[in-house]
Amino acid sequence: MVYTEQFYVGYSDCGADMTLSNTALLRYFENIASMHGAAVGDSPLEVPYRWVLLSYHECVLRRPKFNSRVTLKSWNRAVKGVTSCREFELYDEGGDLICTAISNWVRVDAETGKLQRLGEAVAEQYGSEARGNFDSPWIPKLKEAAVYDVEKRYMVERNFIDANRHMNNVCYLDLANCVLPQAVWDKGESNTFSIHYRKASYYGEELTCCYGSGETGATVVVKGGEGDVRAEVAFER
């Protein structure tokens, strides 16, 4: 089952160039995933578990402009053990494909946080589609940079917290953007990027964002107070 929804590219969805930003794109993905879930009886208002994001990989071919409408398609591609794969396709008003993305998720008990094993019933519920735009449904782990050029500290404020009572996945991309050197940011947002989530962050915690550059792009690692990795963001050149 391919779930389809239209989105309006509003002012708050755009960067300085008045095209869709990466953070807005992730919010579109987050919303259509929850819409699909609600459509098949998997609404967080009705079930005793939550879907938690493990990783994203996005490839933007072209960015839609402000005041346009886009069509987003999403489907469950595969289920294995405790992990599920969801893919996305974004189309412009002319029907041209302008972005592909893949994501991996786990399902946890809403009260205990314990991982739940996923079976064929989940694949049937979501009407899994085997097709995909990526070779594998499973996103490989990122390698941490050996040296960091910049480090900044941030507090987890209330506006970072979502319905799962921890820092929302999109906020990690916001923090990664904030730690990028101005010269890097001025070149424009990366059209190919990956995010891996390692551990939840909570209100009142202090996080350290570490930026490092390499031959293929830049990496930002978000760490907790004990130096434990919370998330990794890789921007390709």
State the predicted function of each range.
Residues 3, 55, 59-69, 73-140, ...:
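HotDog/MaoC-like acyl-thioester-processing domains
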Residues 1-53, 100-102, 109-189:
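Hot-dog-fold acyl-thioester-processing enzymes
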Residues 8, 57, 194:
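Short aromatic/hydrophobic contact patches that present stacked aromatics
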Residues 148, 154-236:
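Acidic/His-leaning functional-site neighborhoods
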